[in-house]
């Protein structure tokens, strides 16, 4: 979606929210109660106002608080800064929004925005909503409609750090919602006129609600005053749900979305409730209630839903008795609106389920009583949001740990409890006919989005299922196989798994049997319950030093940077045991908002996984790549410019995928589109990562928009094997048919030819006192209250990798000193947000950027070049400079070891180095590290320097050591000698080279370089 369309959609949503509020207040005049935090009408308004102010911010983590403090009076700033439950600037931004609504001053603040566009450009990108004159003018006009709306909002709310509104599970149970507090006159026959703007057309606009984030509202029809509801669209959605496992709208199947507005039948729940309460015996009321087609929505998963209701109903005896009593008296809904909205009430079965054998000629009183129960159960909610994707409120529920497994089997809280806890087995405010696989996913890490619930049982899955045609033999055939082996290891083959109705949070809908080629190829068993990747099974070595060493290595965590470090989230905030792989990237709310704004193509598109991979490894041109899996697309992301932090290199629709090809030893994965027009080769360099990606991809397609049959997964790698055998045969001077490859992997290889030239002096350590660059520059000293910048002259010196800023050339004490090569600095970039030309920023980790300005473009370019060189050189540690490490392929045959580059287009191999296995005398490793040193015999005709090989993780190193030891033992009939690295200087050199490999990988996408606590996308 184009930025202009996004901004138009945001303003359209604000308009709908303001109109709804105005309709209430216009009808009630002076009797209208004030809007409070827990009211649903506030939820959508604040969500869209917050989106408008966040859209285009340069630093989302700080929110718009850094801007609005320039316009806000001091006592209000102090009032917000001392809030005890608001800890972040993003939360303070929303507290300021609440304060502006309370004071009816939001329009005045926006006028200040309009008068200070220069100040806005410092904090927003150029295409931000508030930086567009037309959009800001319309925004101001819409907000002026809130002038006479009364708000009574509490600013000190802990959820403001995560969301602009109160999550459903946080709402007090004993407080009435805004619609329930309205005077009784509003609930009369004029309800249609009050909501006349909310016609079928406007409802269709509202489901396509937000281009930034899924709507947090379950539907306007949940309210006491209701808009029309489309029965035809309900039937369409029920038909769709029998084909798709998730009842998710498929944007690629346009046939399902065509429903004429003339086919819809509006049914207003308010008029039904009032007529039934006033005259329950009238035939008209019964006739109107009979038209409600609840049974057609209930046919999905009917039998299992009944069982769940029977099991769950004893958990709520109080609410059930109260409800039965009310139904017997014939009054109910209007008298107790709070009970009618309690999600615990939805566990009662519908009349069609309880009385299937009832005659159609039953008495009118009995039918009225049953029909009233039918009204209570479905709550007549607008399910369009549920068919499209999870609302943002469900994401907030997950982040707060509301779906913790410890609460799944707990009893419901007593009615007098002040805060609502999620009832077991369903999400808050979720209608009983929704897909429970969306409502209760697995417990997840902090800000982590997953697809598969670890307790979900696939149809027909088991320990002894044969693998499908697209599965490796060592991959289990059931999504729950790994967890069952961990938790139910003693269960026999004949025993059945836990019943579906006893498992809270499992799919209630009966899934269709899938074709054999649609079975999900899952990761190996260990990654589901352990953070450590596990290599594929190979032959066990003889007992000895190598086996013990490998066992110890498996216990060590991978030294790769964890995803928590990538996202700026501390490792302690998530459970490491639930991490499937260190390369999985945890997405927090700020990242998710950025992805929704800049990447996602569909409204309500859901993020499944974000995985860190690479491209070009086998060719020696390693580049970082992020693979983003949603329910519609596979996005391949690269580093972007400053205003757009990342670039969408490709967006591949699941419907475009023809097949997936796995490379040799699962080191690469190739996505091939229909007609083979587009192909994308992704590097994994890790068996466990390849299996994780394949499992995630297949899960995303099954739960997303792709309909069966699913793309085949080819694991034979026939063409790659033939090309590699041909290359090895040429190098070994033998026939291709005689070649046997025991190992193929993507590694970093320290070229011994570079080492043979002698130690290279570290170029990052110039002689003491050497001046790299110095000169007079201007720096931004301060910014006035109205945004006017104040620049001062300074003398800047870059010496020994440290940047010094002095007030004048003659001064001795610097104003500031920055170590360009350490964690203190994150690089430099041009500055487009200042008033001065030729300005650039030095990015600092612990303080705002240092903004400098040169006199000319050439001088600025020279300074930036020197600063970038100082940063890149500073990454290389002091001391012995490590030799360049070449990304390449490593091949082990029966008698030789090869390093080579492979052209992925032509499958042409270029040899980098060759060694005979018989010439290897020993191998040296360090415990818990993924590198090794191969030592060669000095008596061999080919004199070789030691080879240093760096692999992606310890599991890949174990796989390499196993293959190497087996080949060496086949020659000498004894185990290959293993040694430990003891010399401190050599050990430090290898550590430095390893850190250089990792930092070079991160620098390619500007990640984690000196700013672990900052937003990695900035």
Swiss-Prot record:
Q: What positions does the domain PH occupy?
A: 770-872
Q: Determine the domain of life of the protein's source.
A: Eukaryota
- Which BP terms in the Gene Ontology apply to this protein? autophagosome-lysosome fusion; late endosome to lysosome transport; lysosome localization; natural killer cell mediated cytotoxicity
Which residue stretches belong to region Interaction with KIF5B? 1-289
Q: Which residues carry this modification: Phosphoserine?
A: 423
Compositional bias of type Low complexity: which residue ranges? 230-245
Cited PROSITE patterns: PH_DOMAIN, RUN
Q: Where in the cell is it found?
A: Cytoplasm; Lysosome membrane
Biased-composition ranges, Polar residues, are 258-270, 316-325, 347-367
User: Would the keyword Cell membrane turn up in this protein's UniProt record?
Assistant: no
SMART domains, per database record: PH, RUN
Q: Where is the composition biased (Basic residues)?
A: 294-306
Give residue numbers for the modification (N-acetylmethionine). 1
One term under GO cellular component: autolysosome
Q: What ranges does the record give for the region Disordered, renumbered to this chain?
A: 210-367, 407-440, 452-520, 526-545, 555-583
Function recorded in the entry: Plays a role in lysosomes movement and localization at the cell periphery acting as an effector of ARL8B. Required for ARL8B to exert its effects on lysosome location, recruits kinesin-1 to lysosomes and hence direct their movement toward microtubule plus ends. Binding to ARL8B provides a link from lysosomal membranes to plus-end-directed motility. Critical factor involved in NK cell-mediated cytotoxicity. Drives the polarization of cytolytic granules and microtubule-organizing centers (MTOCs) toward the immune synapse between effector NK lymphocytes and target cells.
Name this polypeptide is given: Pleckstrin homology domain-containing family M member 2
Q: State the organism named in the record.
A: Mus musculus (Mouse)
Upper lineage is: Eukaryota, Metazoa, Chordata, Craniata, Vertebrata
Chain's gene name: Plekhm2
